[in-house]
Amino acid sequence: MTAYILTAEAEADLRGIIRYTRREWGAAQVRRYIAKLEQGIARLAAGEGPFKDMSELFPALRMARCEHHYVFCLPRAGEPALVVAILHERMDLMTRLADRLKG
C-alpha cells in the first residue's frame, strides 16, 4: 500500500473520531472502526478502490467514503499522499474542506 501522512487538521479529526467512538461505544469498537478507517485511507492514498476525483475543486484531490466518514487526500509524486481531512458524513463537507485547502 502507498504510504500517507496526515495534516495536523486530519490528525485532529482522527483523534476526535477516536474520542467520540470510545465514549459512545467503547474501546473494542474504537479498534474495529479505526482499523477500517486506516484501511480505507491506505486504499485511497494508493488510488485503489472506489474514490471520487475532486480535481475541479482542488488539483489532484481525491475523496472516498470510509464507513461513516469521508476522507480527502492529495497524492504526491515521490512522496507519501497527504490526507487533508477525515469528516463525518453529516458535516458540511465542502465548507469544512474549503477552509482546509485555503492554507
UniProtKB/Swiss-Prot annotation:
What's the superkingdom here?
Answer: Bacteria
The answer, when asked if Oxidoreductase is one of the entry's keywords, is no
Annotated InterPro entries: RelE/ParE_toxin, RelE/ParE_toxin_dom_sf
Misc remark: Plasmid IncP-alpha RK2 is maintained at 5-8 copies per chromosome.
Function summary: Toxin component of a type II toxin-antitoxin (TA) system involved in plasmid partition. Acts by inhibiting DNA gyrase, converting supercoiled plasmid DNA into a singly cleaved linear form in an ATP-dependent fashion. To do so it probably interacts with one of the gyrase subunits. Gyrase inhibition is prevented by antitoxin ParD, and is reversed in vitro by incubation with ParD. In cells that have lost the plasmid filamentation and growth inhibition occur; this is suppressed when ParD is supplied in trans.
Hydrolase: present as a keyword of the record? no
Q: Which gene encodes it?
A: parE
Q: Name one GO molecular function term.
A: DNA topoisomerase type II (double strand cut, ATP-hydrolyzing) inhibitor activity
Q: Name one GO biological process term.
A: protein heterotetramerization
Q: Which family does it belong to?
A: Belongs to the RelE toxin family.
- Supply the name of the protein: Toxin ParE
Matching Gene3D superfamilies, A to Z?
RelE-like
User: What keywords sit in the KW lines?
Assistant: Plasmid, Plasmid partition, Toxin-antitoxin system
Pfam families in the cross-refs = ParE_toxin
Subunit and interaction comment: Probably forms a homodimer in solution, interacts with ParD, possibly as a ParD(2)-ParE(2) heterotetramer, which neutralizes the toxic activity of ParE. The heterotetramer binds DNA, but not ParE alone.
Which species is listed as the source? Escherichia coli
